[in-house]
């Protein structure tokens, strides 16, 4: 059994709706274990750094503004196939295209305010996890 880790961020829109617990319940029911978590208000610098790969995209500034508009819940999830399992729970980036019962279909407002971020590959997950968490903050379960 090969365990993977993925980074998950519950975005300001979902935090404002008070659905963190609902989302965590879905993670746990799907076999994803929370091995690190922090509730925080991202600074502009943190948001710009995290989304630096999108710096030249037309939506970059709006994305940064949205991500600093309120607190976020950031967690590291662990399981077999964690990246794919988490992305399946999230649903399509655009909630209009997300399957019924997915996090984005149930809690997202728009493609911009789409409730949650999930790493798109094992390689990016490692980079994203390290961006927000020191190795000592990740607790094995």
Curated annotation (Swiss-Prot):
Major role in the synthesis of nucleoside triphosphates other than ATP. The ATP gamma phosphate is transferred to the NDP beta phosphate via a ping-pong mechanism, using a phosphorylated active-site intermediate. The active site is at 117 (pros-phosphohistidine intermediate). This is Nucleoside diphosphate kinase. ATP binds at residues 11, 59, 87, 93, 104, 114. It comes from Xylella fastidiosa (strain 9a5c). It catalyses: a 2'-deoxyribonucleoside 5'-diphosphate + ATP = a 2'-deoxyribonucleoside 5'-triphosphate + ADP; a ribonucleoside 5'-diphosphate + ATP = a ribonucleoside 5'-triphosphate + ADP. InterPro entries: NDK-like_dom, NDK-like_dom_sf, Nucleoside_diP_kinase, Nucleoside_diP_kinase_AS. Its EC number is 2.7.4.6. One of its GO terms (molecular function) is ATP binding. SMART domains: NDK.
